[in-house]
Amino acid sequence: MKNIGWMLRQRATVSPRLQAYVEPSTDVRMTYAQMNALANRCADVLTALGIAKGDRVALLMPNSVEFCCLFYGAAKLGAVAVPINTRLAAPEVSFILSDSGSKVVIYGAPSAPVIDAIRAQADPPGTVTDWIGADSLAERLRSAAADEPAVECGGDDNLFIMYTSGTTGHPKGVVHTHESVHSAASSWASTIDVRYRDRLLLPLPMFHVAALTTVIFSAMRGVTLISMPQFDATKVWSLIVEERVCIGGAVPAILNFMRQVPEFAELDAPDFRYFITGGAPMPEALIKIYAAKNIEVVQGYALTESCGGGTLLLSEDALRKAGSAGRATMFTDVAVRGDDGVIREHGEGEVVIKSDILLKEYWNRPEATRDAFDNGWFRTGDIGEIDDEGYLYIKDRLKDMIISGGENVYPAEIESVIIGVPGVSEVAVIGLPDEKWGEIAAAIVVADQNEVSEQQIVEYCGTRLARYKLPKKVIFAEAIPRNPTGKILKTVLREQYSATVPK
């Protein structure tokens, strides 16, 4: 039976002296043998708190070796980790604790004010029996035993519950099992060029699925994880050189920041091979900037529900297929579902995925779980197109698509054009009701109005987009509302600006 905690134990047996986790900012350096021992002590602490198989343990912590080992320790007990975004406000965290039925909450020092606010509520989460801060955890770990837990668990047993962003209401808890996480890590490790003793930089938060899966596949492949809890573009290149980093994880926005610092111009990092990125297509110009430094870029498309797996655009195709999310990873099928409900290998439609990497269910939401699947295919809610070579191009979210005069208009396509207008710093395109067309595309733009006007934006789009795709309305705003994970709240924008459209 596959158990993620057991995998760490096996790596500690095979490679006991190999560095597992390095955090230069705190001078933490831990081998796989040491990390496994710490995971066992974490399991002992959890057992003393009454945690048993199936119980939920909430982790409200920044990246740290303790986060990793609490996750592994819970896995060894058959308990279920609930990683929580440290940027969430008290009411949002409180909802997750209540919805997940978490029994123990372990939190870092920066989250203490949020925890205090939750505990001061008139009706705090009733299932929580213990609130463990960083100091209390450290004290308990000092006296904990490092023996391997003797618990039979793994396979289809729940491993973690991770809550989606919730742009349209309360977030849903995505349940992954030991099996789905093992499959996702295997899929990544079998698709990309990752080698034993590689050193991988992780500046992304572990409460997100891609980073958490990276932690796990690092143990699977015998990789050293270089952690950067607080991303700093001015320090990252020196860290890459000093720690002989081979691979880095980042989103396109971070990569754009990194190339603007002075250190990038003088960069000499012979060990570094490539970045893995996702969340948005990498601009072709940025790919070329990194290629000039002999740094390749691997891009991916994934969801929390697919445990960070889905498609990958390997570096050899980065320019030839610029704008694509790549092809399906190993052990994964990706297709499109047409309006007629037929699943097709090529063409345009809703992106669907079939694989062992998929979620088991949405926590306590059987109807949402049923609606998410079509004969084993997970419906992503994204609109995409798969070309004749099997490369996926994401068009937009299904729920955000605008139907104007009978034509499908994809906001993401318009946004990708408007962001190229000099002076524009942010943009969100939404559909607003229109008596003539049914809906029109409206662009909410954050820009310096001394540099750019509505007419300039429309004219710029007119040379790059079909006429029916042009924004019929441009609204300048000081800011665009986002949720704590940075996703634009288009429901808020639609509510805010619908009243401005003449009837």
Swiss-Prot record:
Reported effect, R197A: Alteration of the strength of the membrane binding
Catalytic activity, reaction form: a long-chain fatty acid + ATP + CoA = a long-chain fatty acyl-CoA + AMP + diphosphate; hexacosanoate + ATP + CoA = hexacosanoyl-CoA + AMP + diphosphate; tetracosanoate + ATP + CoA = tetracosanoyl-CoA + AMP + diphosphate; hexadecanoate + ATP + CoA = hexadecanoyl-CoA + AMP + diphosphate
Localisation: Cell membrane
Family matches, as Gene3D superfamilies: 3.30.300.30, N-terminal domain of ligase-like
Keyword Cell membrane: yes
Phenotype of gene-disrupted mutants: Inactivation of the mymA operon causes altered cell wall structure, reduced contents and altered composition of mycolic acids along with the accumulation of saturated C24 and C26 fatty acids, and enhanced susceptibility to antibiotics, detergents and acidic pH. Also impairs ability to survive in macrophages.
Residue(s) at site: Membrane interaction: R9, R17, R195, R197, R244
GO cellular component: cytosol; peptidoglycan-based cell wall; plasma membrane
Coiled-coil stretches: none
SUPFAM superfamilies in UniProt: Acetyl-CoA synthetase-like
Biological pathway: Lipid metabolism; fatty acid biosynthesis
InterPro entries documented for this protein: AMP-bd_C, AMP-bd_C_sf, AMP-binding_CS, AMP-dep_synth/lig_dom, ANL_N_sf
Any one of the GO BP annotations: response to acidic pH
Effect of T214W: Shows a marked decrease in the activity with lauric and palmitic acid (C12 and C16 fatty acid) with a simultaneous increase in the activity with caprylic acid (C8 fatty acid)
Keywords in alphabetical order: ATP-binding, Cell membrane, Fatty acid metabolism, Ligase, Lipid metabolism, Membrane, Nucleotide-binding
A GO MF term: long-chain fatty acid-CoA ligase activity
Site (Important for substrate selectivity) residue list: T214, A302
Effect of A302W: Does not show activity with small, medium or long acyl chains
Pfam families on file: AMP-binding (PF00501), AMP-binding_C (PF13193)
EC number: 6.2.1.3
Function comment: Required for maintaining the appropriate mycolic acid composition and permeability of the envelope on its exposure to acidic pH. Catalyzes the activation of long-chain fatty acids as acyl-coenzyme A (acyl-CoA), which are then transferred to the multifunctional polyketide synthase (PKS) type III for further chain extension. It has preference for the fatty acid with long chain length in the following order: hexacosanoic acid (C26), tetracosanoic acid (C24) and palmitic acid (C16).
PANTHER family assigned to the protein according to its UniProt record, in alphabetical order: ACYL-COA SYNTHETASE (PTHR43201), MEDIUM-CHAIN ACYL-COA LIGASE ACSF2, MITOCHONDRIAL (PTHR43201:SF5)
Family: Belongs to the ATP-dependent AMP-binding enzyme family.
Self-association and partners: Homodimer.
Protein name: Long-chain-fatty-acid--CoA ligase FadD13
Organism, as annotated: Mycobacterium tuberculosis (strain ATCC 25618 / H37Rv)
